[in-house]
Amino acid sequence: MENQPKLNSSKEVIAFLAERFPQCFSAEGEARPLKIGIFQDLVERVGGEMNLSKTQLRAALRLYTSSWRYLYGVKAGAIRVDLDGNPCGELEEQHIAHARQQLEEAKARVQAQRAAQQAKKREAAAAAGQQDEGVRRERKPRPQQPRRKEGAEQRKPRPVAAKAPREERLTPVSDVSVLTVGQALKVKAGNNAMDATVLEITKDGVRVQLTSGMSMIVRAEHLVF
């Protein structure tokens, strides 16, 4: 006995039934309502063929009768058919209402799935946009520096030398008669000059008081102002 090929999916089983019973099943287009109890007829007619089991036949029938094209065919005035396409009675109103409800629920599920997919795409696009914006912010180009002319020497600013404080110009006292008591002047001591105040003008010189409080008589050539 030769081995028969095995059908692995419900779609393959439906394609086999449409080829075997073209007056009952169809692989595309609007489907005709099936006779009530057609499952038992299938078991009797194709039992053992193509290694089909009852489970496979039941699953294929469930997929076929829940498809949109089959539910569209379950409408007022439609006639049920058997495996050979013979009429087997008109559809009842309750069966038509049930098919209409199944079709509406199936459409609602598809719309909900599409809406969820659209929302995920929008979220992914928004997240990608934020990430790109963050990368652009991180990689913000630095302002372009003006190009130096070719051959131009790079000049470094010269350090500015600190100006030495100007030496205070002092006038030597040549005539003590020009001095007055309380007048501020300086007493020369080597290269330094100390602040002092005139206390008294004597014949021996000028008595002055230093800022330290010490008083002394100084000759005119040691006084400046």
Curated annotation (Swiss-Prot):
Keywords: Chaperone, Cytoplasm, RNA-binding. Residues 147-156 have a biased composition (Basic and acidic residues). GO terms for molecular function: RNA strand annealing activity; RNA strand-exchange activity. Residues 107-169 are annotated as: Disordered. It is found in: Cytoplasm. Residues 109-118 have a biased composition (Low complexity). The keyword Chaperone applies. RNA chaperone with significant RNA binding, RNA strand exchange and RNA duplexing activities. May regulate ProP activity through an RNA-based, post-transcriptional mechanism. Belongs to the ProQ family. NCBIfam families: PRK04950.1 (NF003434). This is RNA chaperone ProQ. It comes from Klebsiella pneumoniae subsp. pneumoniae (strain ATCC 700721 / MGH 78578).
